[in-house]
Amino acid sequence: MKKTSTRLADGRELVYYDLRDDTVRDAVDRRPLERTVTTSEVRRDPLLGDSVAVASHRQGRTYHPPADQCPLCPSRGDRLSEIPDSSYDVAVFENRFPSLAGDSGRCEVVCFTSDHDASFADLSEEQARLVLDAWTDRTSELSHLPSVEQVFCFENRGAEIGVTLGHPHGQIYAYPFTTPRTALMLRSLAAHKDATGGENLFDSVLAEELAGDRVVLEGEHWAAFVPYAAHWPYEVHLYPKRRVPDLLGLDEAARTEFPKVYLELLRRFDRIFGEGEPPTPYIAAWHQAPFGQLEEFEGVTRDDFALHLELFTIRRTSGKLKFLAGSESGMNVFINDVPPERAAERLREVASS
């Protein structure tokens, strides 16, 4: 992998990740852009203890432009985009309309491919590995920013999810705090460790799932299953079999196997609802250990956390979506219409032949 860092016309960072070591990236952003002014602010809820990012400038962000005006496609002639070069393998840049900025963190856009009409599932294993390497490098770089405590790599896919750009891409949020979801896992981890005399909860969950009937896919270094208490109609958790706290901890064997396993999962998701159905909308979310101090979680260290990817769709059946209504939105109690055992069975049924 070759990495080339440059700047866009308004000063935002752009990083190219290339498969070939001899690739030259010297194109200049010719757009007359002024420096981005953001209004990102993080406010803490005194009752719930969680945080809300207030970012009113995002109301003016680009919304479903036609393909020939896509800001994530390479620049061609007089059609200038966020990517100044006429081609790229993987490109990452600071979001022009960030939810988090300055002391409130940082937001980046990850372009998986220059092919506007592709999806992650269409990538070659070599290209998917390059995306993994880009995620890993950005996790490392962002973790060193003084305001950053946790790095979150994710992909929203599909208009039903709320995606505003059709080009295949993901995002990275670098938070200035430990997120509430991660804090819950760390508290459970600490309680289990204390109650069992040191047993790791992630290890116990993975062992139990691998011995059960909700396994979807298992390789030499990765395992995917539908969790016992899945929140979503079709939800899969993908774990490396060797526990590591973040993407940086993956060894070469796990990195090599990841593309094959992950691409197969994504392709199965597109087959869940049968032939003739539109692509399945999904969210893919990497859970990594925070880089900040963990004194709040007694007895827990970063190495106790287990890196894993959560992949789920909000489509519960053909033509119908799972909405977060009263119980979910008001009380945070999920109602799942699809038994996890049936979801796992269906995901095994649609395996590639």
Predicted regions and their residues:
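HIT superfamily nucleotide-processing domains
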Residues: 1-353
